[in-house]
Amino acid sequence: MKLTCVLIAAVLLLAVCQLDSADAITRDCKTKGYACFASTECCVQDCWLVCLY
């Protein structure tokens, strides 16, 4: 399951997160409870939250 989780997170990072980087900066990850300095960092946390929960 953990390997699958990592693969899913990687796919999300490559496909969704890069396209959504501008939106991540705009909302500053407040919906996820995180305040990030970089869209990439913000995005990683979003993807892992989706994967874990």
Swiss-Prot record:
Region forming the signal peptide: 1-24
Single Gene Ontology MF annotation: toxin activity
Residue pairs linked by disulfide bridges in the UniProt entry: 29-43, 36-47, 42-51
Predominant cellular place of this UniProt entry's protein: secreted
Cellular component annotations (GO), alphabetically ordered: extracellular region
Keywords, in A-Z order: Disulfide bond, Knottin, Neurotoxin, Secreted, Signal, Toxin
Localization: Secreted
Tissue: Expressed by the venom duct.
Protein task: Probable neurotoxin.
Family: Belongs to the conotoxin O1 superfamily.
UniProt note: domains: The cysteine framework is VI/VII (C-C-CC-C-C). The presence of a 'disulfide through disulfide knot' structurally defines this protein as a knottin.
Protein name as catalogued: Conotoxin Cal6.31
Source organism per UniProt: Californiconus californicus
